[in-house]
Each structure stands twice: as C-alpha cells, then as structure tokens.
C-alpha cells in the first residue's frame, strides 16, 4: 500500500514537473543561449591536448580517446 502511494505521488510529481518546465516556449533558448558556432572554441578545455602522450609512447590499456594526442591507444600511442 505504501509503495503504491509512493508511486502515485512520484508520477504526479513528474507530470507536474513536465508541465511546469514545458510552460515556456523560450525555455531552451535561455538554457542554451549561444549556438555552437557562436562559442569560442579557443576557450574550450576539451580542445586542448597539452598533457597528451606523443606517438610511440606507452599509454596503457587499449582505449579510444585516452591520454594520446591522436586519441588512439593500443598499449602504445598511435
């Protein structure tokens, strides 16, 4: 019985939350104020590869993206 009441309250809360957040047409405009092309790519930390490992050096377990400058690691950076 308690679980049923909790589920009903949760569904009502989520339904109300959906209606409250969907109320504004410009909600996404304020959430994402600038388009991707308007952003400064130089300010992004994701684009900087200062601390990466050069090709031919040990990088660890095979993975994509890891510490290598190229982004490819198969025990040795590509």
From Swiss-Prot:
**Predominant location:** secreted
Chain coiled-coil ranges: none
Q: Where in the cell is it found?
A: Secreted
- The record lists its disulfide bonds as 52-69, 59-73, 68-77
Write down a Pfam family by its short name. Conotoxin
> Which residues are propeptide?
23-48
Q: Name one GO molecular function term.
A: toxin activity
| An example Gene Ontology CC term for this record | extracellular region
Q: In which tissues is it expressed?
A: Expressed by the venom duct.
**Could you tell me the keywords of this UniProt record?**
Calcium channel impairing toxin, Cleavage on pair of basic residues, Disulfide bond, Ion channel impairing toxin, Knottin, Neurotoxin, Presynaptic neurotoxin, Secreted, Signal, Toxin, Voltage-gated calcium channel impairing toxin
Q: Which residues form the signal peptide?
A: 1-22
At the top level, the lineage of the source is Eukaryota
What biological function has been recorded for the protein in this entry? Omega-conotoxins act at presynaptic membranes, they bind and block voltage-gated calcium channels (Cav).
Q: Which family does it belong to?
A: Belongs to the conotoxin O1 superfamily.
Q: What is known of its domains?
A: The presence of a 'disulfide through disulfide knot' structurally defines this protein as a knottin. The cysteine framework is VI/VII (C-C-CC-C-C).
What is the protein name for this chain?
Omega-conotoxin-like VnMKLT1-0111
Native organism is Conus ventricosus (Mediterranean cone)
């Amino acid at each position: 019985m308690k679980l049923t009441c909790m589920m009903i309250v949760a569904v009502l809360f989520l339904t109300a939350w959906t209606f409250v957040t969907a109320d504004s047409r410009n909600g996404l405009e304020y959430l994402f104020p600038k388009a991707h092309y308007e952003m400064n790519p130089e300010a992004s930390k994701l684009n900087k590869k200062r601390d990466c490992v050069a090709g031919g050096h040990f990088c660890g377990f095979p993975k994509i993206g890891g510490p290598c400058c190229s982004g490819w690691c198969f025990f040795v950076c590509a």
